[in-house]
Swiss-Prot record:
PANTHER family given in the database record: AMME SYNDROME CANDIDATE GENE 1 PROTEIN (PTHR13016:SF0), AMMECR1 HOMOLOG (PTHR13016)
Domain AMMECR1, residue spans: 8-204
HAMAP family tied to this protein: AMMECR1
Protein name according to UniProt: Protein Cmaq_0360
Source superkingdom: Archaea
Amino acid sequence: MFKPYNLEQGKFLVRLARRAVEEFIRSKRIIKPPEDTPSRLLEDNYGVFTTIETIREDGSTELRGCIGFPRGNVNTVKATINSALAAAFDDPRFAPLDVNELESVIFEVSVLSPLEEAKFNSPKELVNLVKVGVHGLVIERGMYSGLLLPQVPVEYCWDTVMFLDEACEKAYLRPECWAEKGTRVYTYEAQIFREKGPRGDVYERDLIEELKKCHLDEA
């Protein structure tokens, strides 16, 4: 399993993501890596996605923004700052985050392992290769590409085929594109740190444990 960071480092990243967004809302300034940044986070270059969710009155959550960078072209700290700002202000599905929302949103940071192209000789081999609760997916075909984080199929209780189909649709392709010649499929893992509530304690998600609620083996 891909777990490069301990919980304290994960807490740092989540709080950094929130701080970056709050500072930009208030001053339009992009923060720099803080002086107390753990050195490991400045040395590693990993892809990072930030997810922002709104908490409803009934305690459920609703997506408010999710953007990131799957390939580690900068260090993890800079990638976290950049992805947090993009999720808050540049997600085309939503209006920019407002200062009045800061007390009702949760931040989640996903640190991605390097992408690995899946090697398979048949659709069945690919289905056996991709593990829900472990892998995220990137689908590429021609000029089209789509990415789904590992937590997405767990949250929706998708099986592997549905996960692959949805990744194709995310790339604006036919659901079955993953089984067609010429489509490139990449897998990766993610270490996911999340606030329990707005400004709350940070914990590391265990997708395998969360997946048990889906009872996919019983279907």
